[in-house]
Amino acid sequence: MCLYPRLLKNKKYTKNNKNGGKIPAVSDERTLLVPVKCGNCLECMKAKSREWQIRLQEDIRHNKNGIFITLTFSDESYYKLAEEFYGIYGYLLDNQICKLAVRRFLERWRKKYKKSIRHWLITEIGHNGTKNVHMHGILWTDKVTEIEKIWQYGYVWTGNVKNGVRENYVNERTINYITKYITKKDLVNREYKPVILTSAGIGSGYIKRLDSKRNEFKGEKTKETYTTKSGHEVSLPIYWRNKSCIRTKSTVTIIVFGCKT
């Protein structure tokens, strides 16, 4: 539960298209305001991490070609990208550099293959060596050797090579590793807030599964939970609630690069 929720006006009691401009009678004044998660406290970050864990685990059920990836920046590339931002410094600059680099990486990929590469990346500040910002995550592609050529900003880790065979895998353990950065306590970079850069529709395959039928709107009998592989019932991610047309008192949409995810 959010530690610092904000209270916003309940749109139900304002003139809108849904009510035809006729505000319904207020039976309880407490319903005039609705609590909305702050999105920044520890509890909100934990909830965000759990939702991404579920969505990513669901996604790899349907997309089998995901690889664990680490994208870095050389000093030269970092400072060259930094020159494109004026009046931005510190951690904000680090995140802006990552956004720009990923956007250009995707543009180069689309130019060569006529299609974007499915991705989920999260930023982190380094602690050794250059201490430059870098990214961990998953890229869904069979063209592993092309990643470093098209990235162009620094070293790319795509797995260890043993006896000429590249070892790389994406499973539940991998997902737990990358999503931990959402809530990771960095004692050196205490004020740093990581950014998630992602393709739209991560985990959307769940909507096509028969299991999702149990989440369709059925009034008071509507099921708003998701069953994990271990059999645990957890809260259904907001993304699926919206996709399944489940009606709740409040909804949150995550937006990355202007795209609903």
Question: Where are the regions a protein language model picked out?
Answer:
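Right-hand nucleic-acid polymerase module
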Residues: M1-K131, T141-T261
